[in-house]
């Protein structure tokens, strides 16, 4: 999906690859076949789900992953969590950052943020 087509104005940046995923529909975070694939053996095949809300926000769910899902170093429980720009999602040893895209120009020219878990603690 092109960043310009994103209705929510949010993107998720994967630290290990620098890939930016716009969040225009429900996406699964996990290994290999997931929409947001993370190359990390501590990540479950279907680890977590991120989805846009009708009010323009985002929500994150853990999918009963073996090692848990963390947001800003706090473990996500069984209830979904509303995300904000700047939140850092950690699955396994990998971090993903929530980015807010505020205008069409920014959507086209936003730099890619790449960070490892040890860089954000």
Question: Which residues fall in each region the model found?
Answer:
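Short linear motifs in intrinsically disordered
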Residues: 1-5, 10, 17-21, 78-79
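Regulatory inter-domain linker segments that are low-complexity and enriched
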Residues: 1-10, 94-121
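Hydrophobic beta-strand positions
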Residues: 12-13, 63
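Polar/charged alpha-helical tracts
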Residues: 17-18, 55, 105, 115
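Forkhead-associated
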Residues: 19-93
């Amino acid at each position: 999906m092109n960043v310009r087509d994103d209705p929510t104005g949010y993107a998720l940046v994967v630290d290990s690859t620098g890939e930016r995923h716009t969040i225009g529909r429900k996406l699964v975070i996990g290994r290999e076949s997931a929409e947001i694939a993370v190359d990390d053996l501590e990540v479950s095949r279907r680890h977590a789900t991120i989805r846009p809300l009708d009010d323009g926000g985002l929500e994150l769910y853990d999918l009963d992953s073996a090692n848990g899902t963390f947001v800003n170093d706090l473990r996500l429980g069984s209830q979904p969590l509303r995300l904000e720009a700047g939140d850092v999602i950690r699955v396994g040893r990998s971090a993903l950052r929530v980015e807010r895209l505020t205008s069409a120009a920014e959507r086209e020219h936003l730099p890619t943020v790449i960070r490892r878990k040890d860089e954000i603690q």
